[in-house]
Amino acid sequence: MEFAGGSLRLGAERGEERFIFDNEKWGHDVELAPFAISAFPVTNAQFRDYADDGGAPPRYWKKMDGEWRERRFDRWQPLEPDAPVRHIDWNEGQAWCRWAGRRLPSEAEWTCAAGAMHWGEVWEWTASTFAPFPGFSADPYADYSQPWFGTHKVLKGASFATPCRLMNNAFRNFYMAERGDVFAGFRTCRMDP
């Protein structure tokens, strides 16, 4: 999906009738260059091709009788080829992107495209480091966001396990780059020409 770029309002707006975390405050304008983003997250089949070409498989995959299987709770099940790959850490997403000649989207690019793309099956890694928005002020529980600025990566979207009240494209999830236990996957952008 191609986007022309331009100005984007990133973050929550005052007066929204939902719970807003301190790291979503407040909406501010960012400028985006034109970009192209995948309509869907990277699938098991796409990641399987990478693993078959020598890339590291996800931690919950194992080859059995010549076929990749995925651990789901206490069972090894055949991969669903069209399902988004999950339990991928940020570094694994970056490695796949290098292999495929793609890149992770920025938080702003993902947010810009959110209204036009399918999301909500897995949290999606972005290229963006978790940082405060301009004018950030910690909520009374200061340890929710502030200690993690600069050391975590932003994930956008939601997973099947996300409560409905948190499912909106302004929500900013964040984890350390090596966390692969999260229901996380990724989508990609075309490399800039």
Task: Locate each region found by the language model.
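Active-site microenvironments of metalloenzymes and redox enzymes
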Residues: E31, F35-A113, R190
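Extended, Lys/Arg-enriched charged tracts that mediate electrostatic binding to polyanionic substrates
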Residues: M1-G6, L10-G11
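Surface-exposed recognition segments
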Residues: D22-H28, D52-Y60, M117-P193
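Short hydrophobic-aromatic micro-motifs
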Residues: L8-R9, I37-S38, W123-W125
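PP2C/PPM family metal-dependent serine/threonine protein phosphatase catalytic domain
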Residues: L10-D22
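Surface loops and adjacent helix of pleckstrin homology
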Residues: E13, F40, S128
